Each structure stands twice: as structure tokens, then as C-alpha cells.
């Protein structure tokens, strides 16, 4: 049993899956991360300050943790993946890269990446779940927050976009609730999607109540001035089976 683990004092996003890979190789069955920062304190990183993990404030690390959780569930106990650099690619679609500060899961149905990646999805036509930070061959996005794109049924997708997170002070220097270390910014960015099941022509509908963006039609795959929030994307000509 691992209780507890975390790469201390770093903001890199490649460590979590690599650590889980090692734990599973060593035969561990229970792997607990420590510790997730409460949203009300994460702006200053005052909670167990050598650790810093929060979806809003450390989006790259949070996506890396999501990938590590998939690794913990799917990697076989006792399986060896060789020595570096061979062990940077392991299991069913996992990859880590120090040079790119990147964790990836690319197994056909799921495509997750903690930072910008040039890796094409294994089979874009079979994707049902996408999560990332930055751009990839199927998503162009310049915002710094995480995003999640999930298939609800054929032609219907749910998009959630987190606000930008900008580091403004050293998160691991002496902490204080009077010192902000990461700033959350609710900006707008264009997002270009190249998801075969969705196509380039689709409707966009805001689902969160405070978002006053009206339903609109996208004709070229590019959602302009996208603000943080939750959206329903529906391929043109698609009749959903569920309301």
C-alpha cells in the first residue's frame, strides 16, 4: 500500500504516471496521492505547501493525475517496462516526456494530454473522451486551463472549459494568504475542433446558467471567443436519442 505519494516542490506534469508505473511494477495494489489543495486556498498554496495540486490552479498537473489514475487501474502488477528511455512508453497508450513536460494517454477511445502534444490520436474516429491542456492534432487552443470533451452519444458531445491559470509567484516559496501564487483569469479564446464524429459543422449550446451565450452554429470547426463553461455540441443533422 502506498500512502501517500507526490512529487514535491515541482510544477511539472510528467511525474504522476511515471511514479504509478513504478509502484505497479513493484506490486503495489493501493496507491494514494497526497494532497489535493482546497479550492479556497489553492490561490496561495498554503495547504501542505510542498504539494500543489488543484484542477483550476494546476491544470497540467491535474490532467497528469487523471492519466496516472488510468495507469493505476490498467497496468498489471509486477509488469516491467524496461529502463529509460524505453520505459517512457508503457501499458496501453501511456507516454511520459521530461523534454516536453508531458503525460499522455492515447488508447483509441481516450486521448488525454497534460501539455501541448503533436501525437495524433490512435484512432480519432473511435474517440469518446478527450482531456487536455494546450493544443493537439484534434484541438487547437491557446488558453492555459484544462478542458474536457466527452461523447454522450454519436454526434453529441459535452465540452467543459476551465479558466486560465497563470503563475504569478513561486508556489513553493514561503506561503501567505496575502500572496497569490496562481491567478485565475476568465478570458476568451478560440477553440478549433477536428473530431470526426462531431465534424466541422455543429451547434453550440451553453449549459451553465450564468453563461448568456446563445445557441449558435459553427460551420468551420472553430468556436470563436470561447469562455470558460459547459457546452453541448451537436453535429449538424444529428437527432439525439436522449433529451
PLM segments and residue spans:
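C-terminal beta-sandwich/jelly-roll accessory domains of carbohydrate-active enzymes
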Residues: 111-243
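Aromatic- and carboxylate-lined catalytic core of secreted/periplasmic carbohydrate-active enzymes
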Residues: 37-173
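Catalytic-core region of carbohydrate-active enzymes that cleave or remodel glycosidic bonds
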Residues: 1-42, 48, 52-67
Amino acid at each position: 500500500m502506498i500512502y501517500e505519494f507526490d512529487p514535491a516542490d515541482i510544477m511539472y506534469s510528467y511525474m504522476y504516471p511515471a511514479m504509478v508505473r513504478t509502484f505497479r511494477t513493484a506490486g503495489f495494489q493501493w496507491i494514494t496521492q497526497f494532497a489535493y489543495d482546497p479550492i479556497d486556498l489553492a490561490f496561495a498554496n498554503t495547504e501542505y505547501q510542498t504539494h500543489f495540486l488543484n484542477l483550476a490552479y494546476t491544470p497540467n498537473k491535474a490532467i497528469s493525475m487523471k492519466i496516472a489514475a488510468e495507469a493505476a487501474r490498467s497496468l498489471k502488477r509486477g509488469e516491467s517496462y524496461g529502463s529509460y528511455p524505453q520505459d517512457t512508453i508503457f501499458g496501453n497508450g501511456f507516454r511520459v516526456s521530461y523534454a516536453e513536460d508531458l503525460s499522455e494517454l492515447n488508447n483509441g477511445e481516450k486521448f488525454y494530454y497534460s501539455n501541448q502534444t503533436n501525437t495524433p490520436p490512435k484512432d480519432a474516429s473511435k474517440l469518446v473522451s478527450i482531456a487536455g491542456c494546450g493544443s493537439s492534432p484534434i484541438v487547437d487552443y491557446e488558453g492555459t486551463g484544462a478542458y474536457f470533451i466527452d461523447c454522450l452519444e454519436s454526434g453529441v458531445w459535452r465540452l467543459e472549459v476551465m479558466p486560465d491559470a497563470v503563475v504569478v509567484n513561486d508556489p513553493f516559496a514561503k506561503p501567505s494568504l496575502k500572496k497569490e501564487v496562481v491567478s485565475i483569469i476568465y478570458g476568451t479564446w478560440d477553440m478549433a475542433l477536428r473530431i470526426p464524429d462531431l465534424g466541422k459543422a455543429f451547434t453550440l449550446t451553453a449549459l451553465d446558467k450564468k453563461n448568456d451565450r446563445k445557441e449558435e452554429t459553427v460551420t468551420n470547426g472553430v468556436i470563436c471567443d470561447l469562455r470558460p463553461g459547459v457546452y453541448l455540441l451537436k453535429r449538424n443533422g444529428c437527432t439525439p436519442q436522449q433529451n
